[in-house]
Amino acid sequence: MARNAKEHPSIKWGPFHARFPGVHLRLQPSLMIQGAFMLLATCGAVTPLVMQYFQVSFEVAWTVSLIMLFWVIAQTILFGDAYAAGAITAALPLTIVFLNTLTPGAEAVEGMVALFLVVIALFLFLGVTKLGAAFNHFFPTAIKAGVIMGAAIAALQSEIERLPTMPITLISAWVIIMLLMFSIPFAKLPDTKAKVMAGSNALLVSFIAAGLIGWLSGELTFTIEWGFFIPPIGETLATLSIWAVGLPSWEMILTVLPIGIIIYVFGFSDLLVANTLLKGADEARTDENINIDPTRSHYIVAIRNLGQLMTAGPLLWVHGPIWTGVQIFLIDRYKKGRAVMDSIYSGPMNFYLLAIPFGLLMPVIGIITPLFPVALSISLLLTAFACAYISMSMVNTNVSRGIALTIGFLTATLGPAWGMGVGIVLHLMLIGLKKEELTEKEVEGIKDDLLSRKTEHVG
């Protein structure tokens, strides 16, 4: 088939491309509504954690989440990346382990500001120098696998501790999401319309089912109020923004450096997966040329995290390049042709566009707020499951597996500094300085696992 592809129209500014809804990108209401509820429920999952660790009100925590959504959609509308933006979800369990070592309130805020700044600096420096691939390859595969295993252990540990608070609701949510996303017997069932619909919207189905079961069991209570949520912007800036809290100490920056490095490795791996997915989409359609620029993507992730600090303050999520499950879902639609999705850029725009307006409606807040613990639990459970199988697929010798598990346990219990430190010593003692040339296998393994699923958590 002859290829007559052009890049979608945009307003170019510097290395970026702005594409606005209704001007450059076609609106699709059904996609907007589905995306808004999924994004609010998933992104809002950390709102209770922001309240707990930063000692702020729900209003302030919710405002920070809404501003995060602005920077999420800005990736496509203002900066021109085709990725469905998200957060670096694998980092969340390690972030929680770190915050548990700090005093809730001012110290925890300082710690997260420091972590954001380290991640920003890494993405900027390695983007400008184009050394991201070399930096990522510098870490032996066994150590990377161990860090990812640490995220899995920490995530699963946190959910086991949370279980007694609402056992019926959480177990129901876990069973449904695991059945829809990972069950081999379920996958072998005939591809009926109901099965395809449930599998393609696994997060939404699990939220709705868990909400209904939780309400029937009395574990969840929904309070519906009418009106609009007025974000306390002034209070939020005065409480959490970098303008108010100031720069963290050098001691704190050095403390978070190992975690920041791990988060960058996670983020770079997300970019590898994202680029692989987009290249597949680009090959499937001959009517559009998808502009993939890893250097620009580094800049965008850095700008989004810096913008978060300057316009609101940190969350427990760190902005990342891709929400993998949504990206796969949107690419599946994109491959069906221009009649289904006009441009690769219109997918993320439509999926995210109504999230902020819906997040200002009190009835919507009343419906999704009780589901925050469920959304967080599902996100962490999926993170644990995905990180575990990715970690195990990266190592192919018994020694490497043993090192990975040791690093994972130490990372989850004592923190990333211990995990990486002991991991480096073990690697030198048991494997030596030789490189395990598994990078391509690692990427392909992740790609195959991701492409076999229709939807997944943030990041």
Swiss-Prot record:
Where does it live in the cell?
A: Cell membrane
**Has keyword Disulfide bond?**
no
* Bilayer-spanning residue ranges: 31-53, 60-79, 84-106, 113-135, 165-187, 196-218, 228-247, 252-274, 309-331, 351-370, 374-396, 403-425
Annotated keywords: Cell membrane, Membrane, Transmembrane, Transmembrane helix
Q: How does it sit in the membrane?
A: Multi-pass membrane protein
Q: Name one GO cellular component term.
A: plasma membrane
This one is known as: Uncharacterized protein BH0208
According to its UniProt entry, this protein's organism is Halalkalibacterium halodurans (strain ATCC BAA-125 / DSM 18197 / FERM 7344 / JCM 9153 / C-125)
